[in-house]
């Protein structure tokens, strides 16, 4: 089990600390850094501890920033892997690897060491998160997707981007700009990953791990994804993602149309795309009428222009689910966080991640060829 953070947040050194940290500031940098979360020494804090002023940064969850790689590319990763197999002598070890080299190396080793499901989930959060909020979100995601035996996810790559920590509407537009910058970082990660695959598996002594990678985007995290897709050239896209889950997506309902040239690339990237929507989503209603020039939102109204993608794009209506896990005012009134608040939505997501035929996923009614409703 491993949880990594990919972030284009500013790197700072807090007063009195000896190690670098990601900043809470609403400021993005051109490059991203990789960190690994430390769960070996993690202890669940009491409610009293959570209320303290110093419950911030590493007091929420410890993490270690990977060093930057000395050389670009993944030839050194290949050299280390072949050395560990006794095929090639080398003085290099895993400690010589940095950044995505170290992360891809660790994931490959972990995922290829078991015959059981050991999936990776890339998660992109939405609006209104500072870095401390992101660390708390990581703890929630670990409980839901890694600790839960009903889920095939064993590893998480959390995409951290400097969303606003303010509820002031104007900050929404700052988040749009940040999401565009962060989408560029995500695009670079995708290209690095495809280069890793080419460099490593061009050698016949190394076999693919035959595990799955999923991509999950919530709310305005879909703007980050959209920015990445804008930048991806079709001829460079490899189908390296199994399931894509678009949760309460705060993007235009037209994003799958060819004129948008963004989400219509997802069928080239993934085996299946699932759009989870809630027609009573108050957050997306506010987004539509106050910040997006009355443009209906994908996660509330559903998509247009997906007829040609019906075989692999599904719409899952969560309007009638119960918030039985988290039922305070925020979740019951907002109808925006079903993946956190509803066991029915989580159950549906787990079946999706396992790759169960969409017509065989339980607790759904089939409304159309590719449109389903989760039972209340």
Name each model feature, range by range:
Residues 1-88, 127, 135, 149-211, ...:
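Lipolytic serine-hydrolase domain surface
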Residues 85-117:
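Acidic, polar low-complexity linker/tail segments
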Residues 91-99, 137-146, 299-306:
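Short, mixed-charge, low-aromatic patches
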Residues 106-162:
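Short, surface-exposed "cap/lid" segments of acyl-processing enzymes
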Residues 141, 225-228:
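Hydrophobic packing residues within well-ordered alpha-helices of enzyme cores
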Residues 186, 217, 221, 225:
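Gly/Ala-rich beta-loop-alpha elbow adjacent to hydrolase catalytic centers
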Residues 214, 218-219, 245:
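Residue in the alpha/beta-hydrolase core beta-strand immediately N-terminal to the catalytic nucleophile
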């Amino acid at each position: 089990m491993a949880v990594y953070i990919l972030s284009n947040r500013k790197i700072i050194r807090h007063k009195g600390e000896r190690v670098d940290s990601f900043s809470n500031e609403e400021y993005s940098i051109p490059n991203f850094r990789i960190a690994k979360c430390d769960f070996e020494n993690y202890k669940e804090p009491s409610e009293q501890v959570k209320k303290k002023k110093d419950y911030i940064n590493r007091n929420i969850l410890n993490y270690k920033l990977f060093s930057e790689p000395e050389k670009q590319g993944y030839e050194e990763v290949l050299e280390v892997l072949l050395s560990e197999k006794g095929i090639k002598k080398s003085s290099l070890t895993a400690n010589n690897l940095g950044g995505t080299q170290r992360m891809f190396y660790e994931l490959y080793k972990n995922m290829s060491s078991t015959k059981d499901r050991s999936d990776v989930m890339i998660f992109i959060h939405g609006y209104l998160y500072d870095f401390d909020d992101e660390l708390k979100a990581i703890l929630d995601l670990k409980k839901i997707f890694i600790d839960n035996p009903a889920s095939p996810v064993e590893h998480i790559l959390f995409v951290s981007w400097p969303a606003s920590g303010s509820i002031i509407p104007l900050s929404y537009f700052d988040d749009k700009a940040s999401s565009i910058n962060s989408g560029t970082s995500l695009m670079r990660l995708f290209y690095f990953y495809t280069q890793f695959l080419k460099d490593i598996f061009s050698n016949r002594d190394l076999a693919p791990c035959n595990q799955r990678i999923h991509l999950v985007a919530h709310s305005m995290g879909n703007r980050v994804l959209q920015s990445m897709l804008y930048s991806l050239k079709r001829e460079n896209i490899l189908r390296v993602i199994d399931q894509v889950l678009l949760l309460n997506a705060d993007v235009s309902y037209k994003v799958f149309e060819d004129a948008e040239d963004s989400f219509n690339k997802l069928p080239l990237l993934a085996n299946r795309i699932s759009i989870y929507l809630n027609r009573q989503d108050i957050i997306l209603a506010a987004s539509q009428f106050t910040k997006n020039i009355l443009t209906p939102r994908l996660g509330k109204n559903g998509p247009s222009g997906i007829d040609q993608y019906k075989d692999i794009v599904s719409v899952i209506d969560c309007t009638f689910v119960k918030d039985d896990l988290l039922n305070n005012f925020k979740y019951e009134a907002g109808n925006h966080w079903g993946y956190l608040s509803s066991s029915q939505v989580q159950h549906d997501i787990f079946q999706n991640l396992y790759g169960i035929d969409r017509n065989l996923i339980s607790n759904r009614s089939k409304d159309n060829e590719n449109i389903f409703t989760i039972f209340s």
